[in-house]
From Swiss-Prot:
GO terms for cellular component: cytosol; glycine cleavage complex. Its cofactor is pyridoxal 5'-phosphate. Its EC number is 1.4.4.2. HAMAP family: GcvPB. Pfam families: Aminotran_5, GcvP2_C. The modification N6-(pyridoxal phosphate)lysine is found at K274. This is Probable glycine dehydrogenase (decarboxylating) subunit 2. It catalyses: N(6)-[(R)-lipoyl]-L-lysyl-[glycine-cleavage complex H protein] + glycine + H(+) = N(6)-[(R)-S(8)-aminomethyldihydrolipoyl]-L-lysyl-[glycine-cleavage complex H protein] + CO2.
Length: 492
C-alpha cells in the first residue's frame, strides 16, 4: 500500500466547476428563501465549499480513514478512558430504522419503543449503581459531573444551607472534577493522598468543615487503587453535612462486585461511551447519565421518562428540578448501544468484564515492574500508573517513550496524569484484549526501557515510522493553524 506522508486538504483538491453529485432539477422558487427568512439570516456571499469529482472525494476520505487510529486498528491502553472493543451488534441495533429514523419531536404515542429503551436503560443503570433514580440527559462525563453538582447545590439551598460552597477533590482526581466544581459555582478544595495512593483520612478531617458541600471521588481511584476506607470517608463527609459524588470513569473495575450506592455515594455519573461500549475517541457523542438517591430525586433534570399503565411518557412534573440540561433527551444512539451491551452481557457477563479488566491490568503491571518505577506496588484494579523516572536518568522522558510506542502500532497510554506521579504513564488495557496483545505491548515497553539506557537517541527522535513526525508543540500552542486561510498564509 502506498501511503503519502502529506495529504492535500480537500480545499487544495478543489477545481472550479467540478462536482460529485447532480441534484434533481429544483422545484422551489429561487426567491423562496428570501421570502421565508429575515435578511440578516441570508448569506451575502457564496459558501466557499470545495469543488471535487466524486472519485477524488472518495479517495480523500479513504486516505484519511487509513491514517486514523482507533480501537479497531490496534491496542489503545489510554488510562482512564476504557478504550474497550465496541461490539458490532451495537451498531446493528442502533441502525434499526424505527430507532435511527425517529425524531425527538414526534408524539409520545409514535415513539413508544424508543421511550421504552430509555426507561429500561434507566432501570438497568439503577440496578448496576445502587441508585434510586437515573436521568440519561447529560451528554458526557463532565456534563454529568456538573449536573450532579447542580443537584447538590439545589439540595443544600432548599435545606437552608446555601453557604456550603466547597467541594473536596483528591490530588489524584480527574481534571474535570475541580473544573466542574468551579463551573457549578463551588470552590475546589484538595485532599492529599497517603503513601498507598488512597485518600489521607487525617487530611480529609482537616479540610472538611461547615462549608463542605460534597466530595468527588472515583473508586477505584485514578491511580487504579481501591479506596478501602470508603465507609470512613462516607461517615466523615455525611456527619459534616456534605454529600458524596461518584465519578463513574472507573466503574469498569467493579461491576456486579460492589455498587456506588452501597458504598454511601449520594449521586453518580456513568460514561456510557466508556464502560458500556459507546464508540468514543473522536470527540463523541458521549453520554453521562446521573443517578441519585431518593433524597435527591426531586432535583433531577426534567423531563424524566416514566411508565404508567404500560405506556411510556415524559414527566415534567418534578418539584425541585434543576431544569433541562440537554436538548430533547440526550444522545439516544448511545443509549441503544449501551442497552444492547448490558442485555447481551447480563449480570454475570458484566462481573466477568470487571474481573478480566483487573486481571489484564495486573498482568501488565507484573511484567513491567522490574523495568519501570512503580510508585504504588500493591495490586491494582483496572488500571495502574507507572513512572518514567528511571528512564529520565538517561535523558529520556515519558513523552519520548509514548512517541516511541507509535512506531510499534500501539496508541500511547495517558501520560503525565495524574499529576502526583512524576513522569507518570497511566495504563488501562480493558477486558477485551488477549494475552498475546498484552505480551506484545509489554515486550515493546521493555524494549523501549532498554533503548533508553543503551540507545537513548532512538527514543528521543521517535516516532520513526508515522506519517507525521514530532510536532513543534510550542508553535502549535502559540501560532495554531486552525483554518485553511491560516495554512494558505503560511505557505505564501
Amino acid at each position: 500500500m502506498v501511503v503519502s506522508k502529506s495529504s492535500p486538504l480537500i480545499f487544495e483538491r478543489s477545481k472550479k466547476g467540478r462536482y460529485a453529485y447532480s441534484l434533481p432539477k429544483k422545484e422551489i422558487d429561487n426567491g423562496a428563501v428570501e421570502k421565508l427568512l429575515d435578511d440578516k439570516f441570508i448569506r451575502k456571499n457564496k459558501a466557499e465549499l470545495p469543488e471535487v469529482a466524486e472519485l477524488d472525494l472518495v479517495r480523500h476520505y479513504t486516505e484519511l480513514s487509513n491514517k486514523n487510529f482507533g480501537v479497531d486498528s490496534g491496542f489503545y491502553p489510554l488510562g482512564s478512558c476504557t478504550m474497550k472493543y465496541n461490539p458490532k451488534i451495537n451498531e446493528k441495533i442502533a441502525r434499526i430504522p424505527g430507532f435511527a429514523e425517529s425524531h425527538p419531536l414526534q408524539d409520545e404515542s409514535q415513539v413508544q419503543g424508543s421511550l421504552e429503551i430509555i426507561h429500561s436503560l434507566q432501570e438497568e443503570l439503577k440496578e448496576i449503581t445502587g441508585m434510586d433514580e437515573v436521568t440519561l440527559q447529560p451528554a458526557a462525563g463532565a456534563h454529568g459531573e456538573w449536573t450532579a453538582l447542580m443537584i447538590f447545590k439545589a439540595f443544600h439551598q432548599k435545606n437552608g444551607e446555601g453557604h456550603r460552597d466547597e467541594v473536596i477533590v483528591p490530588d489524584s482526581a480527574h481534571g474535570t472534577n475541580p473544573a466542574s466544581a468551579a463551573f457549578a459555582g463551588f470552590k475546589a478544595v484538595t485532599v492529599k493522598s497517603n503513601e498507598r495512593g488512597e485518600v489521607d483520612i487525617d487530611d480529609l478531617k482537616r479540610v472538611v468543615n461547615e462549608n463542605t458541600a460534597a466530595i468527588m471521588l472515583t473508586n477505584p481511584n485514578t491511580l487504579g487503587i481501591f479506596e478501602k476506607n470508603i465507609m470512613d470517608i462516607r461517615n466523615i463527609v455525611h456527619e459534616a453535612g456534605g454529600l458524596l459524588y461518584y465519578d463513574g470513569a472507573n466503574l469498569n473495575a467493579i461491576m456486579d462486585k460492589v455498587r456506588p450506592g452501597d458504598m454511601g455515594f449520594d449521586a453518580v455519573h456513568l460514561n456510557l461511551h466508556k464502560t458500556f461500549t459507546g464508540p468514543h475517541g473522536g470527540g463523541g457523542p458521549g453520554s453521562g447519565p446521573v443517578g441519585v438517591k431518593k433524597e435527591l430525586a426531586s432535583f433531577l433534570p426534567k423531563p424524566m421518562v416514566v411508565k404508567e399503565d404500560d405506556v411510556y411518557k415524559y414527566d415534567n412534573d418534578i418539584e425541585n428540578s434543576i431544569g433541562r440540561v440537554k436538548p430533547f433527551y440526550g444522545n439516544f444512539g448511545i443509549y441503544l448501544r449501551a442497552y444492547t451491551y448490558i442485555r447481551t452481557m447480563g449480570n454475570k457477563g458484566l462481573e466477568e468484564v470487571s474481573e478480566a479488566a483487573v486481571l489484564n491490568a495486573n498482568y501488565i503491571k507484573a511484567r513491567l515492574k522490574d523495568h519501570f518505577e512503580i510508585p504504588y506496588p500493591q495490586y491494582c484494579k483496572h488500571e495502574f500508573v507507572l513512572s518514567g523516572s528511571k528512564q529520565k536518568e538517561h535523558g529520556v522522558r515519558t513523552l519520548d517513550m509514548a512517541k516511541r510506542l507509535l512506531d510499534f502500532g500501539v496508541h500511547p497510554p495517558t501520560i503525565y496524569f495524574p499529576l502526583n506521579v512524576e513522569e507518570g504513564m497511566m495504563i488501562e488495557p480493558t477486558e477485551t484484549e488477549s494475552k498475546e496483545t498484552l505480551d506484545y505491548f509489554c515486550d515493546k515497553m521493555i524494549e523501549i526501557a532498554n533503548e533508553a539506557k543503551e540507545d537513548p537517541d532512538k527514543v528521543l527522535e521517535a516516532p520513526h515510522t508515522t506519517i507525521i513526525d514530532r510536532l513543534d508543540e510550542t508553535k502549535a500552542a502559540r501560532q495554531p493553524v486552525l483554518k485553511f486561510e491560516n495554512l494558505r498564509s503560511e505557505k505564501e
